[in-house]
Amino acid sequence: MPPVCGRRCSRTGEIRGYSGSIVRRWKRVETRDGPRFRSSLAPHEAALLKNLAGAMIGLLDDRDSSSPSDELEEITGIKTGHAQRPGDPTLRRLLPDFYRPDDLDDDDPTAVDGSESFNAALRSLHEPEIIDAKRVAAQQLLDTVPDNGGRLELTESDANAWIAAVNDLRLALGVMLEIGPRGPERLPGNHPLAAHFNVYQWLTVLQEYLVLVLMGSR
């Protein structure tokens, strides 16, 4: 069985990823134009990131293109989003409700209706810009992933976009894997979703390493 993502190599300190991939550390280099963040990807890792990001952009495009239009949008140019939460579970994870009070009583219809109405207004107003931000980050990742793998160098803006986009990819995969706040940490090798879980873990470590080097910790 290939190494499970998240297992550290004792000799190199690198983290082994899905199907034996290795999450390579990022290196921060100071230049006249600001910091640069360097690493490398294997060809199959680059292809995976491109496929996942492309699929996520497609989901967001579908959601955006189906949003309602109204007279106010035509007059002001301010886009109106959906008032209702997405039906697709992956989109619900990417575009969650904006507001839920800690003391909300689900058995109180009046309180629930008030919360849903407030969420609908916030979603209609803010969802379009959130979709745009997620698409921009995912597209920035696509634009900076080397086509056939190999070395890559990110600006600080690129690095922040990668962190946001990879986090969204993890959220999307987490829906398929039904991952909650506490795990699971790994799946048996014969589990039907073991390969997807290994990808999820690989993305987690990739994101963690980039966050650390961006903060100057590594």
UniProtKB/Swiss-Prot annotation:
Pfam families the UniProt entry points to: DUF2017 (PF09438)
Regulation of this protein's activity per its record: Activity is modulated by the formation of a disulfide bound within the N-terminal Cys-X-X-X-Cys (CXXXC) motif. This intramolecular disulfide bond is formed in response to oxidative stress, and results in oxidative stress-dependent interaction with the sigma factor SigH.
Signal peptide: none
Keyword ATP-binding: no
Effect of residue 9 to A: Forms dimers independent of the oxidizing nature of the environment, but cannot interact with SigH and cannot rescue the growth defects of the deletion mutant
Motif CXXXC, residue range(s) on this chain: 5-9
Keyword field: Activator, Disulfide bond, Redox-active center, Stress response, Transcription, Transcription regulation
Intrachain S-S bonds: 5-9
Disruption of the gene: reported phenotype: Deletion mutant shows no growth difference in vitro in nutrient rich or limiting media, but its survival is compromised within peritoneal macrophages at day 4 post-infection. Mutant shows a marginal decrease in the survival upon exposure to nitrosative stress and markedly compromised survival upon exposure to peroxide radicals. Failure of the mutant to upregulate cysteine biosynthesis during oxidative stress generates a domino effect, causing differential expression of 6% of M.tuberculosis genes, resulting in attenuated survival.
Transcription regulation keyword on record: yes
Oligomeric form and interacting partners: Homodimer. Under oxidative stress, interacts with the extracytoplasmic-function (ECF) RNA polymerase sigma factor SigH.
Function: Transcription factor crucial for intra-mycobacterial redox homeostasis and protection against host-derived oxidative and nitrosative radicals. In response to oxidative stress, interacts with the ECF sigma factor SigH and, in conjunction with SigH, binds to an auxiliary promoter upstream of mec-cysO-cysM, leading to the transcriptional activation of these genes encoding a non-canonical actinomycete-specific cysteine biosynthesis pathway. Increased transcription of mec-cysO-cysM results in enhanced production of L-cysteine and cysteine-derived antioxidant molecules.
Family stated for the protein in its record: Belongs to the AosR family.
Protein's recorded name: Oxidative stress regulator AosR
